[in-house]
Amino acid sequence: MTLLQRQIPHRVAMGLLLTGQRITAAKALDFGLINEVVPRAQLDAAVARWVGQILACAPLSVQAIKQVVRQTGSLPPREAQALRLPALVAALQSEDSQEGVRAFQEKRKPEWKGR
């Protein structure tokens, strides 16, 4: 329940929680609960595309983003910002950050090392 009320407007969450109403995938998309709706036959391809997009990113950055989002989701903005800064500094000081800049300059895909 707590997660739902953080994801969608209060009145919508209350309506769903109090009535037990089921929602369609299209409604979940409208509410911002999910990122995409695809026909069942295209589900595997859509999952592969999402996974590919995430795996194309620097692993340390993905890890830091997940950690910061989990830690700061319920914090006031000022406290959240204080926790984000160390993760940003660590990511910018990584070997992968340097590789990302080099790859951009050389117009090639980066080769992430997770360091």
Model-derived features: positions:
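Crotonase-fold acyl-CoA enzyme core
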Residues: 1-60, 94, 99, 108
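Helix-loop "lid/cap" segments that line or gate small-molecule binding pockets
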Residues: 16-17, 68, 72, 86-92
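Short, flexible turn/loop "capping" segments at secondary-structure junctions
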Residues: 26, 80-81
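Hydrophobic alpha-helical core bundles mediating ligand binding, dimerization, or RNAP-core interactions
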Residues: 51, 69, 81-88, 101
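Terminal low-complexity tails and localization/encapsulation signals of metabolic enzymes
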Residues: 102-115
